């Protein structure tokens, strides 16, 4: 096995930055650090990263995708890992727009963590930083009596994970079991 160590940072400031990371090994399998928080649910798998990661991959081709919010260019790279190699990667993310400087602030007001979610509190803590959201709203939802992980949170602002730059709120979706086909969100 080869070990990949990645350092993610803002290309302009040089500051470490949080991002989501997708790594595929030579067999086409998703790889993540053993202790990482994973995105659970449909779509491309990724792990949340607060700036540095380390993981092992078998020898062969490795594809890496690093993404942060909507204002940064995705960083894609491919490399070849030889057995027992130690690969140190510097992963600079380039910002293509600075919308907050124009008084536009990114956010997501419609997030669910489904019944398969294993670390909802860690994920809600990381979500605004990895996506660079100023506002994050996680929705409570009742559908087919599934135990949505997001339903474990109390309604209102989550002061324990909100910061001066990232507000995390728990809202309730206005569609439930009785008429789920007629809902319009929060």
Question: At which residue positions do the language-model features occur?
Answer:
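Catalytic cores of extracellular degradative/oxidative enzymes
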Residues: 104-186
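Surface-exposed loop/turn motifs at beta-strand-loop junctions within extracellular Ig-like
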Residues: 10-12, 68-70, 95
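A short, solvent-exposed beta-strand micro-motif common in secreted/extracellular proteins
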Residues: 21, 45, 59-69, 128
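A short, amphipathic beta-strand motif
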Residues: 2-11, 21-23, 62, 91
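Extracellular beta-sheet/turn segments enriched in Thr/Pro/Gly and aliphatic residues
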Residues: 79-99
């Amino acid at each position: 096995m080869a070990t990949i160590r990645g350092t993610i940072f803002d290309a302009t400031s040089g500051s470490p930055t949080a991002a989501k990371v997708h790594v595929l090994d030579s067999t086409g399998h998703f790889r993540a650090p053993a202790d990482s928080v994973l995105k659970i649910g449909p779509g491309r798998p990724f792990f949340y990263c607060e700036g540095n990661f380390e993981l092992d991959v078998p020898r062969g081709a490795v594809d890496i995708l690093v993404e942060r919010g909507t204002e940064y260019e995705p960083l894609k790279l491919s490399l070849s890992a030889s057995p027992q190699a130690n690969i140190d990667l510097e992963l600079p993310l380039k910002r293509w727009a600075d919308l907050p400087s124009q008084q536009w602030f990114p956010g997501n007001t419609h997030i669910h963590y489904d019944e398969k979610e294993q670390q909802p509190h860690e994920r809600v803590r990381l979500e605004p930083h990895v996506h660079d959201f100023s506002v994050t709203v996680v929705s409570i939802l009742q559908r087919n009596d599934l135990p949505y992980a997001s339903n474990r949170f109390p309604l209102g602002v989550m002061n324990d994970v909100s910061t001066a730059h990232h507000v995390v709120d728990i809202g309730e979706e206005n569609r439930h079991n009785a008429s789920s086909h007629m809902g319009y969100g929060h």
